[in-house]
Amino acid sequence: MNVVGLTTTTADRKRRAGQRLVVGLAGASLDADERAFIRDARPGGFILFARNVEEPRQVLELNRELKSLLPGELPPIRCVDQEGGLVQRVKAPATVWPPMRFVGNVGKLEFTRAVGRALAREVRAVGFDLDFAPVADVDSNPKNPIIGRRAFATSPEGVSRHVAAFIEGMQDEGCIACAKHFPGHGDTATDSHLELPVVEKDPGEIEHVELPPFAAAVAAGVGTVMTAHVLYPALDEDAPATMSRRILDGILRRRMGYGGVIVSDDLEMKAVRGRYPLEHQLAKASEATVDVFLVCKELHLAHEAWEGLIRLAETDKLEDDRAVAACRRWHALRERFLRHLAPTPGLDELGCARHAELALRAAAEGAQS
């Protein structure tokens, strides 16, 4: 397996640092500054949002262009948030899915697998490799402003069963899944896009409610796990989960046995931005075994993150070793999912009769449950 950055030259450190970034774009096509950054930093992936989407053919061509700019053994992993409900970046003529709560309410795991397969086929049809789905949070707080019906259920048992089934369906179709937001964003009363949520629970309650869906995701072979910018004082009173070695390395990796890729939530979110210096965020998150960092919109912040990761590796041998380990995991994900990938589904998959029938059934049966 060819893995970037196994020597200690400055060039390799720069390449490793770029590999650890998944960056967003400003619009529906690349501008000159974005092209220059891609040429210099060679990021490990990209994430597209509604602002980048005009229609399916345009998204497919943009994703193809992004891949063509970084040829060779390290193709970028092209990502999207396509959950269903309010979080759908590619809309009609793609299937418009109800919230995953409706899918969970249907109560049949084979149905959930079928939805995962259908979503995977549609995002792959427009050129994506990874869907930041499913939400593995338990909707346990009625005052939660950001999770709600994005979660499959209000119980850890229900979320666990449907998260595992969805991941199996999605990854069976060759699309990398992501369980988010570890160790849980379901019992917050604030939105981490706006401020740092704090979950005041004892360890036993966290063990019983928040963690089981993520354990189920790990058992199902999930390709990636996304962190939560949430503070759990009972687990770590000093740092939010994204920056907590006790939570990520101690619980997710060591206790749950997860050896895959850990992705940070967006570094632009106000839960962390402005509260912690960027280089401190990067250092603590990397120490906690975060592999890849999301910078979803601001190119200047992506550039600062790239330079920050380079500086950390140049001044700290342990950080240099962590960067190598992160790149190994990121590239192992490519090897697992992209090397022997089935042919890309055609654009006629979007909104096809089979998928429309699934969405209609979820909307009808799930709303009544």
Regions flagged by a language model, labelled:
Residues 28, 49-52, 102-110, 148-155, ...:
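Second-shell loop/turn segments in exported
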Residues 81, 119-129:
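Acidic-leg catalytic submotif of subtilisin-like serine proteases
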Residues 91-105, 141-152, 193-194:
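Surface-exposed, active-site-proximal loop segments in enzymatic domains
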